[in-house]
């Protein structure tokens, strides 16, 4: 929704990943894109953008367009929110969206060092609570392992916060050393780091789906996936073929979804692929 613009310019991203997104900088462009997406057989849409200096994705101009998309298409609508207060959460819920995806950070120090925000970890908990109280149908927390320059700091606290809300899905990401950012040469989280995060999420949120999301290092991908499956992950974005075969060998029933890792279980049937 913001093109390549981001006021926050976090140290792990610097707006880099906005360049790979479809730009819909006006409400009319969002409606046109979603209409075309459905005509082409799309399942859903992730609506995101750069953040302002307060860590918010400025959604207010798009509320009516989001409402139109829900009323006029069959797309699953997932919105990446950033920080929200109760009023903003209620406005967003009134549009009828299906999913709110929220990045959750458990360390105040990491928030300051990486995001440059004066916010606290509890502000992310308040965002989760505001969305729940506003009755957004599905609130999906995302936790980035190694966000603080590759160090493991605050991930356990983030999971403890998330646990309070009984999420249907928890998405785990891994820091990617991104060219052109202050973190381009840091050591990313290891396969073991990712697996430990998966195991913690599985133990703390036993009823939730635990997903390895799309943003994670590609180095050591197969080993990370193997350990993640053994640790309790039940969703992996674009898994390697060997991981799929290994999961089958461990007794898992493997299903393929054409959609985002944050799709809640109750909507999975709309994204199932016939193989």
Feature names for model-found ranges:
Residues 1-28:
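Canonical Radical SAM [4Fe-4S] cluster-binding loop centered on the CxxxCxxC motif
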Residues 18-32, 84, 153-157:
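Glycine-rich anion/phosphate-binding loops
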Residues 6, 10-13, 34, 214, ...:
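Disulfide-bonded cysteines in secreted/extracellular proteins and peptides
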């Amino acid at each position: 929704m913001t093109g390549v613009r981001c006021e926050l310019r976090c140290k792990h991203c610097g707006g880099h990943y906005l360049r790979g997104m479809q730009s819909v900088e006006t409400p009319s462009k969002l409606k046109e894109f979603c209409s075309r997406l459905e005509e082409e057989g799309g399942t859903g849409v992730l609506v995101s953008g750069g953040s302002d200096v307060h860590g918010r994705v400025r959604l207010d101009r798009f509320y009516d367009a989001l409402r139109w998309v829900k009323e006029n298409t069959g797309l699953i609508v997932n919105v990446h929110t950033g920080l929200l207060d109760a009023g903003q959460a209620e406005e967003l819920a009134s549009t009828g969206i299906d999913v709110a995806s929220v990045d959750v950070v458990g360390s105040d120090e990491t928030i300051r060092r990486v995001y440059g925000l004066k916010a606290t970890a509890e502000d992310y908990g308040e965002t989760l609570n505001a969305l729940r109280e506003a009755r957004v149908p599905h609130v999906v927390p995302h936790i980035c392992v190694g966000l603080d320059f590759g160090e493991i700091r605050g991930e356990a606290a983030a999971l403890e916060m998330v646990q309070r809300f009984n999420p249907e899905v928890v998405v785990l990401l891994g820091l990617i050393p991104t060219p052109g950012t202050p973190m381009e040469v840091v050591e990313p989280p290891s396969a073991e780091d990712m697996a430990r995060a998966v195991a913690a999420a599985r133990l703390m949120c036993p009823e939730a789906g635990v997903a390895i999301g799309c943003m994670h290092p590609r180095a050591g991908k197969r080993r990370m996936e193997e350990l993640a499956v053994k640790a309790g992950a039940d969703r992996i974005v674009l898994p390697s073929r060997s991981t799929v075969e290994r999961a089958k060998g461990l007794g898992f029933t493997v299903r393929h979804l054409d959609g985002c890792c944050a799709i809640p279980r109750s909507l999975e049937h709309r994204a199932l692929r016939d193989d």
